[in-house]
Amino acid sequence: MPLLNISTNRKIKNEKELLSKSSYFISSTLNKPENFVMIKLTDGLMMHFAGTNEHCCFIEIKSIGSINSENISKPICEFFSSELQIPPERIYIFFQEVDSNMWAWNNQTFG
């Protein structure tokens, strides 16, 4: 909590650096403690978007509590566009708010 899932057809050369930067960025953006941030990065995928196989990215953010998607969509898109060198019009972001009783860690749910 939160979970950031990054899927892209671009091959990432500096995976560990991207994971570290993304962890700090998402923690700050969502105002959540970084020690609870989990990131899943899947690169080099076969992806097709807007009629082409050009570089694209799907960002999925799941978090307990309210997500102000209107306010954070732009900075998230800008961050990943810059880090992955993918135009913002080739990035989808999916937000999902999760009830605290549906997310568990260390033998118990958060709610």
What is each model feature region?
Residues 1-111:
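Interaction-mediating elements
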